[in-house]
């Protein structure tokens, strides 16, 4: 009886692991078909179908005409994290203030397993309407916020990031060389801010600064995005520097 229970426990853990692998693949590639998931994870279609059907039935995936997508159920978890993290209300207020002042798109981003995730965003009067939200991930090396975060890492940590994630090109302007990335991050450290010149989306520019907590640990990046002719060459740097000082002071006082 003992050995049977242990075997079942191991099988159950393996099943949970597979379910999360499927969820992560759908999240990163949605919408996806059953065949795409089966081929990507090297599992039979019948097995994948059972997993997908179960995840749909419990509300964590949605099945639409164009394929499977993650559901908004995950936003409830994100909201719980927001409530738990004391610095988030101050951060959200600062994002809103910056959007009003700059009249551009303002975003607060953070690093999640080597990818950039968008926590808060606010669109100013002239700002671009942005699709990225808490379900969207970007490579750190292709964004201003990501490079701002990377600039605070050691060389060994940056090399480990590249080993795990690579330096894939998102556009023809994306950095794809480790040497070039190191040079870029040195400039970010020297000037205190990072830029994105059409490295994620053609025609889009951005500038961002890293944000640290009371222990001087970087918790994310505050950035402004817009058309390359308005943002991307250091515009709004002073505005962001002032916002950084105020936000980090508020976080330290919590």
What are these regions (language model features)?
Residues 202, 220-254:
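Juxtadomain coupling helices with adjacent low-complexity linkers
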Residues 205-209:
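Short hydrophobic beta-strand micro-motif common in sensory/regulatory domains
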Residues 2-84, 88, 245, 249-252:
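N-terminal helix-turn-helix
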Residues 72-165:
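Amphipathic alpha-helical effector-binding/dimerization core
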Residues 13-16, 71, 84, 88, ...:
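Short, structured helix-loop boundary elements
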Residues 211-214:
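Sensor-regulatory modules in signal-transduction proteins
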Residues 90-98, 162-204, 242, 246-250:
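Short, basic/aromatic recognition patches
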